[in-house]
Amino acid sequence: MRHFLTLNDFSKAEILEILSLADKIKKETKNKKYEPYLKNQTLAMIFEKSSTRTRVSFETGIYQLGGQGLFLSSRDIQLGRGEPIKDTARVISSMVDMAMLRVYKQSDLVEFAKFSSVPVINGLSDDLHPVQLMADYMTIKEIANGETIAYIGDGNNMSNSWLMLASILGLELHIATPKGYEPNKNFINIAKENAKISGAKILLTHNPKEAIEGANVVATDTWISMGQEDEKERKVKDFESFCVNKNLMSLACKDAILLHCLPAYRGYEVSDKVFESHARDIFLEAENRLHAQKGIMVWLDAHRND
């Protein structure tokens, strides 16, 4: 049985296979053709961290695939508090067909999956956001005119996930963060090893201008992640030169697209003018969460016996 916890668990061929499936299902959806790939299946959606896009996309997705979603908030379930995670996993997985977790600790996801009898999907953790990267690359394949990617901002779960995707697929990735905010060293090392096989080109820099020059795709994310509100004043000062504004964006390719996983804080990681001029890109990316995740769920269902 396969889980979707990190992109590093998948080969290039498997990632592209999932995205091809997602594209097929998206075309069917646009034609109002809803194939019941997951008829009568229940997806448990466990949220330690709240999210508009994650809940709407997964709940709508499983419904359009012929199943139903079961929403469990932090008020309904306390992972590891009271009942051990392994017991929670055993109980929930005995009653549902698949589980999606949006949590703080990646280790909680790994523990849940270890004892789950059904496929488990990482809806987000503090370390990684793999479902978002599947939507992002789906968007790149649809509308970008190249695959040189610049990530500007915090070395958070998004930068870690970009390292995984680019290093597996053999892409060129430039990451610019302020000093002290680099991506997790563990993921940097994994990416370097992957790149030896895939031929990926990865640049880590503290200069956003160096990173963005010649990029076909510019990606950014909030500087203050959920639970880091007390760091806002310090981070705003440290990230001052990392706002994707008109001047910085002008260094990218003329037809570069802009990606942001949302919510966006305009005037901080991206200027309002740049955001609005690339709204088409960003909201297509948001929509593609629905389609990419449907592809993931259908693929996992087909590989239950692996």
Curated annotation (Swiss-Prot):
Carbamoyl phosphate binds at residues 51-54, 78, 102, 129-132, 261-262, 289. SUPFAM superfamilies: Aspartate/ornithine carbamoyltransferase. Pathway: Amino-acid biosynthesis; L-arginine biosynthesis; L-arginine from L-ornithine and carbamoyl phosphate: step 1/3. Its EC number is 2.1.3.3. L-ornithine binds at residues 157, 221, 225-226. One of its GO terms (cellular component) is cytoplasm. InterPro entries: Asp/Orn_carbamoyltranf_P-bd, Asp/Orn_carbamoylTrfase, Asp/Orn_carbamoylTrfase_sf, Asp_carbamoyltransf_Asp/Orn-bd, Orn/put_carbamltrans, OTCase_ArgI. GO terms for biological process: arginine biosynthetic process via ornithine; citrulline biosynthetic process; L-arginine biosynthetic process. It is an enzyme of class 2 (transferase). Pfam families: OTCace (PF00185), OTCace_N (PF02729). It is found in: Cytoplasm. Keywords: Amino-acid biosynthesis, Arginine biosynthesis, Cytoplasm, Transferase. Belongs to the aspartate/ornithine carbamoyltransferase superfamily. OTCase family. This is Ornithine carbamoyltransferase. It comes from Campylobacter hominis (strain ATCC BAA-381 / DSM 21671 / CCUG 45161 / LMG 19568 / NCTC 13146 / CH001A). The gene is argF.
